Amino acid sequence: STGDLLRDAVAKSTELGLRAKAAMDSGKLVDDATVLGMIRERLRLPDASRGFILDGFPRNIAQAEALQKLLGELRTPLESVVLLNVDLGILFKRLTGRRICQDCGKVFNVHTAPPPEGKHRLIQRPDDKEEVIGKRLEVYEAQTKPLIKYYEAAGLLRIVDADADVDTVFKSIEHAVFKHEIKHEIKH
């Protein structure tokens, strides 16, 4: 995810990581140029030549346009964009139930995939709390949802019904990416 790229760059104190840290420490969002710089660096690594997945980026039309420009510079075509289409009630339950082990970093869900008793020290991420989720959904509606039409017009959008269990959703994503045949109505 782009969040992982940010955290890694900050931990390694790269030039871009230091810029990101300065923004985060002052309570600001990391600017698009810094995030795109991190994506550029990551996509230049040899393993990315076999393909890549961007999770959580782009989040708005301006970022999508900048990403398209970057991919053009790298001569790497964008082949598909997957929308995980999930009922808001299910989404809310998944997010509020998500917990991370403080020791190993493994992700659990207290509702759907709880950890073995007493084996993990779990924490809830601040952005998985109810009040923050509401704000994140407002931002999604205002900024991210317009990307649906943007990528649909480009013929790149693949919609996956993500209400099912993890294994079923994973298989649907594989099918959408490799077969380009899954289409559903958007739920929100």
What are these regions (language model features)?
Residues 1, 80-82, 158-160:
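Hydrophobic/aromatic beta-strand patches that form the interior of the parallel beta-sheet core
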Residues 55, 83-85, 161:
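Conserved beta-strand segments of the P-loop GTPase G domain that flank and frequently precede/overlap
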Residues 4, 35-36, 83, 113, ...:
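Proline- and acidic/polar-enriched loop/turn elements at helix boundaries
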Residues 30-31, 78, 108, 158:
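Residue-level detector of short coil/turn "hinge" positions at structural boundaries
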Residues 41, 97, 172-175:
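Residues within well-ordered alpha-helical secondary structure of globular protein domains
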Residues 1-76, 87-93, 100-103, 132:
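ATP-dependent small-molecule kinase phosphotransfer cores
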